[in-house]
Amino acid sequence: MSVSGKIGEVDRWIEQLSRCEPLSEEDVIQMCDLAKEVLSVESNVQSVRCPVTVCGDIHGQFHDLMELFNIGGPSPDTNYLFMGDYVDRGYHSVETVSLLIAFKIRYPQRITILRGNHESRQITQVYGFYDECLRKYGNANVWQYFTDLFDYLPLTALIEDRIFCLHGGLSPSIDTLDHVRILDRVQEVPHEGPICDLLWSDPDDRPGWGISPRGAGYTFGPDIAEAFNHNNGLDLIARAHQLVMEGYNWTTNHNVVTIFSAPNYCYRCGNQAAIMGIDDHINYAFIQYDTAPRKEELHVTRRTPDYFL
């Protein structure tokens, strides 16, 4: 199936999804097949050029994704790099992940979508995406197509050989970017090992490696990040994965930044969101924003499931 012969169809999908209307099951099947073609040729360390806008977790908050495009600029006018966690917890995971995948098919050089720890079969069965697919499609087929596609998402990206981007964090199994490049990523997120760590680990103020309270991945100290950046010629690690109240947060010695792009997370956390714009000269600036106003969902907070945050 060739992407070039399907441009008109992909444009129709984008138009429909931009109205927060889910695609038919048949369209989802076709879209996932096309996306596999595009993603399968990308590297585990996908090379990205400036200018680009870097984004963190979205978690099915579709209207806030629309606000992100409103603030950062529409695709494909702005180049985007999303660092995972498109699904679960929000009410519109199907529409959110579908739109980002459709953009990826239509503008493969303009948008990069990485894998987060929620782009997994096991996690989505617990935190909402599986149930949402059942509710919207009446069966689990669409969930199956999406989660099969998630196996193809790149694990990390490298902006101008200087800024390393990934969902979670570092791994004691990985010293160099070449160690990431040789991983076989086309699989369910494992319970342990380097792929798991890249999607689950968190920076910490304490030096060295630590046991993660999440039960997967590790915590890594400023010394670990400093050594990794030095060994790989990097200026900075940009990652997502953690709720930060102002939308972005630096580690103490400014070598790791966390970016979180789901404002008022779970429709009740009251946090700001942020995106990081990087210009042609690799200067970066953060844009913070609040949740998008939406009249039709004012009742939403009263029926938010009591997820563990």
UniProtKB/Swiss-Prot annotation:
Leucine methyl ester modifications at: 309
Co-factor requirement: Mn(2+)
Residues given in the record as Mn(2+) 2 binding sites: 85, 117, 167, 241
Gene Ontology annotations of biological process type: cell division; mitotic cell cycle; regulation of cytoplasmic translation; signaling
Enzymatic reactions: O-phospho-L-seryl-[protein] + H2O = L-seryl-[protein] + phosphate; O-phospho-L-threonyl-[protein] + H2O = L-threonyl-[protein] + phosphate
Cofactor note: Binds 2 manganese ions per subunit.
Protein name per the record: Minor serine/threonine-protein phosphatase PP2A-1 catalytic subunit
EC supergroup of this enzyme: hydrolase
Function: Essential role in cell cycle control. PP2A may be involved in controlling the entry into mitosis, possibly acting as an inhibitor.
Enzyme Commission designation: 3.1.3.16
Binding site for Mn(2+) 1: 57, 59, 85
Recorded family membership: Belongs to the PPP phosphatase family. PP-2A subfamily.
Protein species of origin: Schizosaccharomyces pombe (strain 972 / ATCC 24843) (Fission yeast)
Keywords recorded for this protein, A-Z: Cell cycle, Cell division, Hydrolase, Manganese, Metal-binding, Methylation, Mitosis, Protein phosphatase
Entry GO terms, CC: cytosol; nucleus
